Amino acid sequence: MASTANPMQVMKKKLEGKVVIVTGGASGIGQTAARVFAQHGARAVVIADIQSEVGKSVAKSIGDPCCYVQCDVSDEEEVKSMIEWTASAYGGLDMMFSNVGIMSKSAQTVMDLDLLEFDKVMRVNARGMAACLKHAARKMVELGTRGTIICTTTPLSSRGGQSMTDYAMSKHAVMGLVRSASIQLGAHGIRVNCVTPSVVLTPLAQRMGLATPDDFHTHFGNFTSLKGVYLTPEQVAEAVVYLASDDAAFITGHDLVLDGGLLCLPFFAPS
């Protein structure tokens, strides 16, 4: 008779007993990550997001141990309060997945850079990440927790592009933040890493016109060396779980790239 056991019940739960915060957890990669973290045995998964109705619905669908907290990461006081509440409510903080990110609606080329949109993107993507990392680190140090902080970046954090200049700049800033923090927080046993997915089939990608795997291959098939596959939110979430787990106990300051070989493509290829 075939076994009906849940595969996650058979697998090792890599976040057993951990208290975890996911910013941007109401949708996209963050929502999937919250579900995967709960499946991996997290004691508490706090979804921190500005999308209150969606966030509450996601937390309810995941069930115990998940909850939703309203938080605008561009407001440092809200970030601090959210982290304080989490540590007080659940008796600690083991992991921060700083995942929230936005893009401008326009192309944002250098010569047509809308600086109001630029400020908005930098406020969320760079300043917001810094606030999350700062206050998560402070709480972990205060509690003597050898925790882990993981930020979401993009291949544009190490490359330029024909557009999205403000987005690329904001993600370059995140990479610098991660590398600096990994050096400064190592003395406290806190590991800081980032995960760098290329295009994932999420609501953000859908707003770019990528609603299906076929759309992905049409627009980005030539920009990966690995053919016939595409990146899913679940794969990104499992990469984050790895970085947060004891399996990665000696990894800090690392950029775990999930790009199908995009960054390895040659600058010049024979015709």
Swiss-Prot record:
Outcome of swapping residue 154 to G: Loss of dehydrogenase activity and strongly enhanced cis-trans-nepetalactol levels associated with a huge increase in Km for cis-trans-nepetalactol
Keyword Isomerase: yes
Effect of residue 125 to A: Strongly reduced cis-trans-nepetalactone levels
Mutation effect (residue 155 to S): Strongly reduced cis-trans-nepetalactone levels
TM regions (residue ranges): none
Any one GO MF annotation of this record: isomerase activity
Active site: 167
Signal sequence interval, chain numbering: none
Listed result of changing residue 153 to A: Almost normal cis-trans-nepetalactone levels
Highest taxon above the source species: Eukaryota
Keyword entries, A-Z: Isomerase, NAD, Oxidoreductase
This enzyme's EC code(s): 5.5.1.34, 1.1.1.419
Residues the entry annotates as binding NAD(+): 24-30, 49-51, 72-73, 99, 167, 171, 200-205
Catalytic activities: (S)-8-oxocitronellyl enol = cis-trans-nepetalactol; cis-cis-nepetalactol + NAD(+) = cis-cis-nepetalactone + NADH + H(+); cis-trans-nepetalactol + NAD(+) = cis-trans-nepetalactone + NADH + H(+)
Residues bound to substrate: 154, 167
Family to which this protein belongs: Belongs to the short-chain dehydrogenases/reductases (SDR) family.
Function of the molecule: Bifunctional enzyme that possesses cyclase and dehydrogenase activities. Functions as a non-oxidoreductive cyclase to promote the formation of cis-trans-nepetalactol. Functions as dehydrogenase to oxidize cis-cis-nepetalactol and cis-trans-nepetalactol into nepetalactones, metabolites that are both insect-repellent and have euphoric effect in cats. Binds NAD(+) as classical short-chain dehydrogenase/reductase (SDR), but does not utilize it for its redox-neutral cyclase activity.
Listed PANTHER family: SHORT-CHAIN DEHYDROGENASE REDUCTASE (PTHR42820), SHORT-CHAIN DEHYDROGENASE REDUCTASE 3B-LIKE (PTHR42820:SF21)
Official protein name in the record: (+)-cis,trans-nepetalactol synthase NEPS1
Originating species: Nepeta racemosa
Taxonomic lineage from the root: Eukaryota, Viridiplantae, Streptophyta, Embryophyta, Tracheophyta
